[in-house]
């Protein structure tokens, strides 16, 4: 059984009579005829293997995978409570994008909203196409209402990822979907169950969450989510509605369902695509063999549960019981503070053996004791427990080091904001940093709130982040799979974990009261966001731009359509006031 999503717009509180499924996921790669795939060597990427080829240097296949997305407002009831949402092609989660390593992905985005938008392709490196990264005010202007923009970029890494809006906190309302890039096989398996997307759920629109965060009560943190979802589904007890809340609601909404074949090995692609919460994931009675973190294949290791911050992914193999019968429970749980604002509802899904079909089947399986015991632990395994499959050494002595102190403080009007070295971020949608840099403008003394760190032509960069604020934070860097050199509490002592082959990720956890040290080779000229992936935190200023090799950015021939997108946006803002309540991202 493939991953399930809610589809269509609901004019009344009903669930769709048919829940559409993501297409069957092939075990190896997608087949095409124009041009012919696979190549004579047997794979779309030729004779390369996971052992002998750099995972960020694909063979270009010449195949274009085209998609057409319409983004519009709607209403759905993911857990039985009807809510306003923003949807991609009337689906939640949005459509699956699927490609082979080295294919070109092309997505035309039509903005049918009454506000701007832009889509970001999480963890794609965008080498030589940084203007396709999809971050308004940084790599492009927002797509104006009624306008469209076509993103074209190479599937330059392989594994599991996702796309989402990067305009304000829109994606928390539903503008997101999974991406699968087929690449080198590492660990064999028999069946691919596809994406399993974990997300916290707010019953109110994202704008209401932001208004609460920035209102006169000077909230330090957002209100906790109302529920938690697996592939867009869970149930909710409608008797918990606030007094006077007349929103249509029905308890016992259907859960997501999956099916295991006895004795077979199944690949599960787990993604945390929520707005805020760290997720604990497990499957009762079945251990998880981890084979990839983010877009990085790793030497396989076995666990009973996973811990994923927002933006993080893990590919795992589950071997079904040889004589398995009945139904088991899949669990996604939001841990309490300091990991997240606690919520009193876990997400569950049903995993069947045999021919069980009832959506409301009860599972009698029990959670792993280790899963229960670890609910108060915010981070996953220590970095020394994870070994990338393909070894890449960290820069021996990075050319430059930047220390960033993260704090939480009130601004002049009393609102709590995050500060990066005493500067809270705010974007200017009308003047994308990448386009300014392309014109030779790399200094912004009149706009310190842009938080641009110009690293010049340095060939390697180390960033040391200290968390003097609240909570553990999932830190995401665009344009790179960075080396996680060290993570810990207190002050960094200068030690680098496994410098010959450190953990590589695009999103890693910065602990409360601690530090995270990352480094990367500066081989990708661009304006790359570095930010907390909690939607409400980046909305509150937890963000900087890494300006990498601006001398080479000036040499880019940026397509004219990027400029036209700005002209369309400027035309829209000439007669419409943009209510930028937050940082803009």
UniProtKB/Swiss-Prot annotation:
InterPro entries: Cu-oxidase-like_N (IPR011707), Cu-oxidase_2nd (IPR001117), Cu-oxidase_C (IPR011706), Cu-oxidase_fam (IPR045087), Cupredoxin (IPR008972). CDD domains: CuRO_1_MaLCC_like (cd13854), CuRO_3_MaLCC_like (cd13901). Glycans are attached at residues 51, 237, 323, 355, 362, 405, 411, 422, 441, 458, 574. Induction: The cluster is expressed in rice fermentation medium. Three regulators are located in the cluster (ptaR1, ptaR2 and ptaR3), suggesting that the production of pestheic acid is controlled by a complex regulatory mechanism. Residues 71-184, 195-355, 431-551 form the Plastocyanin-like domain. Keywords: Copper, Glycoprotein, Metal-binding, Oxidoreductase, Repeat, Signal. GO terms for molecular function: copper ion binding; oxidoreductase activity. SUPFAM superfamilies: Cupredoxins. Pathway: Secondary metabolite biosynthesis. The keyword Oxidoreductase applies. The keyword Transferase does not apply. Its EC number is 1.-.-.-. It is an enzyme of class 1 (oxidoreductase). Disruption phenotype: Does not affect the production of pestheic acid. Belongs to the multicopper oxidase family. This is Oxydoreductase ptaK.
């Amino acid at each position: 059984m493939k991953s399930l999503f809610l589809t269509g717009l609901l004019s009344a509180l009903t669930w769709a009579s048919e829940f559409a499924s993501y297409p069957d996921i092939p075990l190896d790669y997608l087949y095409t005829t124009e041009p012919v795939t696979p190549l004579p060597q047997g794979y779309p990427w030729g004779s390369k293997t996971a052992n002998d080829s750099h995972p960020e240097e694909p063979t270009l296949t010449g195949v274009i995978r085209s998609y057409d997305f319409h983004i519009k407002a709607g209403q759905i009831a993911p857990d039985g409570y009807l809510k306003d949402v923003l949807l991609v092609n009337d689906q939640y989660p949005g459509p699956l994008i699927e490609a082979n390593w080295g294919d070109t992905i092309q997505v035309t985005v039509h903005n049918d909203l009454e506000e701007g938008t832009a889509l970001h392709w999480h963890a794609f490196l965008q080498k030589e196409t940084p203007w396709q990264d999809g971050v308004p005010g940084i790599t492009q202007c927002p797509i104006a209402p009624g306008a469209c923009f076509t993103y074209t970029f190479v599937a330059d890494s392989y594994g599991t990822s996702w796309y989402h809006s990067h305009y304000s906190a829109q994606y928390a309302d539903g503008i997101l979907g999974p991406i699968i890039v087929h690449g080198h096989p590492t660990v064999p398996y028999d069946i691919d169950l596809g994406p399993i997307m974990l997300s916290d759920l707010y019953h109110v629109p994202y704008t209401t969450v932001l208004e609460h965060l920035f209102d006169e009560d000077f909230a330090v943190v957002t209100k906790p989510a109302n529920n938690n979802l697996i592939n867009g589904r869970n149930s909710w007890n409608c008797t918990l509605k606030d007094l006077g809340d007349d929103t249509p609601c029905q308890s016992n909404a259907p859960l997501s369902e999956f099916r295991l074949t006895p004795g077979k090995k199944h690949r599960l692609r787990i993604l945390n695509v929520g707005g805020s919460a760290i997720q604990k994931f497990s499957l009762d009675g079945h251990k998880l063999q981890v084979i990839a973190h983010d877009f990085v294949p790793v030497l396989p290791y076995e666990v009973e549960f996973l811990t994923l911050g927002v933006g993080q992914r893990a590919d795992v193999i589950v071997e079904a019981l040889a004589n398995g019968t009945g139904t088991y429970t899949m669990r996604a749980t939001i841990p309490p503070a300091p990991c997240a604002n606690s919520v009193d509802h876990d997400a569950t899904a049903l995993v069947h053996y045999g021919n069980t079909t009832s959506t409301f089947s009860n599972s009698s399986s029990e959670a792993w004791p280790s899963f229960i015991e670890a609910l108060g632990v915010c981070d996953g395994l220590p970095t020394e427990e994870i070994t990338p499959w393909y070894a890449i050494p960290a820069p021996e002595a990075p050319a430059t080091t930047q220390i960033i102190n993260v704090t939480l403080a009130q601004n002049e009007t009393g609102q709590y904001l995050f500060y990066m070295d005493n500067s809270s971020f705010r974007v200017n949608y009308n003047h994308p940093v990448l386009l300014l840099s392309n014109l030779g403008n790399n200094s912004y003394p009149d706009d310190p709130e842009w938080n641009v760190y110009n690293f010049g032509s340095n060939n390697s960069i180390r960033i040391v982040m200290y968390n003097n604020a609240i909570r553990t934070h999932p830190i995401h860097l665009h344009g790179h799979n960075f080396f996680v050199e060290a993570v810990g509490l207190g002050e960094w002592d200068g030690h680098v974990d496994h410098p010959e082959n450190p953990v590589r990720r695009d999103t890693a956890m910065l602990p409360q009261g601690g530090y995270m040290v990352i480094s990367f080779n500066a081989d990708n000229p661009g304006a790359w966001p570095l930010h907390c992936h909690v939607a409400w935190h980046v909305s509150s200023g937890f963000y900087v731009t890494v300006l990498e090799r601006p001398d080479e950015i000036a040499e880019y021939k940026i397509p004219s359509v990027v400029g036209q997108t700005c002209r369309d946006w400027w035309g829209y803002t000439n007669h419409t006031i943009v209510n930028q309540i937050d940082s803009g991202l």
